């Protein structure tokens, strides 16, 4: 049975990473969390004391840094220049800064090239904001996973490691992130015309994973 590539897109807090990881496990595929790559760049910039006023320096640092994604017992481990940043890149501070990093065309160009190289041999499940529209436009299966802002905030609140953040603040942050992602000039968040829309507000994680797996199986067996 030939391998395919699976593109999973959607807004912040939709559960893309968890679903993509579980789907990859079930298929025996490699999971690539593109959001973690943008978060890794954001973490590096914050370590360097760079912000949106230093775009030239940001691009220069991004070209030199080395990002590694490695499988771990509880999901993917992320390393920047040999330092593990798996937990560090999930902070609320990173959440609030990653959109402006992702909006820089040169940053996207660097990371998209890496992502396309990773997917060249097939057998990849990749999640992000523009996988089906830009990174892997020829992916055999494309899914756009979404849920209401309230549901996405509630899910993120359950998994947050920040003891200070409130549910209301998360809702506000997600709304802001949606606006930034949808309105950016380079590869905005948009559903690919040939993507399957999966509204998961009333669905369990297991139901979402099963739905995506069914789409993959239907394609491989010619049922699409």
Describe each model-derived feature in a short phrase.
Residues 8:
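Hydrophobic anchor at the beta1->P-loop junction of P-loop NTPases
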Residues 13:
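Walker A (P-loop) phosphate-binding loop of P-loop NTPases
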Residues 16:
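Conserved lysine of the Walker
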Residues 19:
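Hydrophobic positions on the alpha1 helix immediately C-terminal to the Walker A/P-loop
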Residues 25-91:
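N-terminal phosphate/diphosphate-binding loop that engages ATP/GTP or pyrophosphate donors
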Residues 70, 115-122, 129, 133-134, ...:
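Small-molecule kinase domains that catalyze NTP-dependent phosphoryl transfer to phosphate-bearing small molecules
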Residues 86-161:
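ATP-dependent NMP and nucleoside kinases share a basic, alpha-helical "lid"
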Residues 142-150, 156-159, 197, 204, ...:
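Glycine-rich phosphate-binding loops of nucleotide-dependent enzymes
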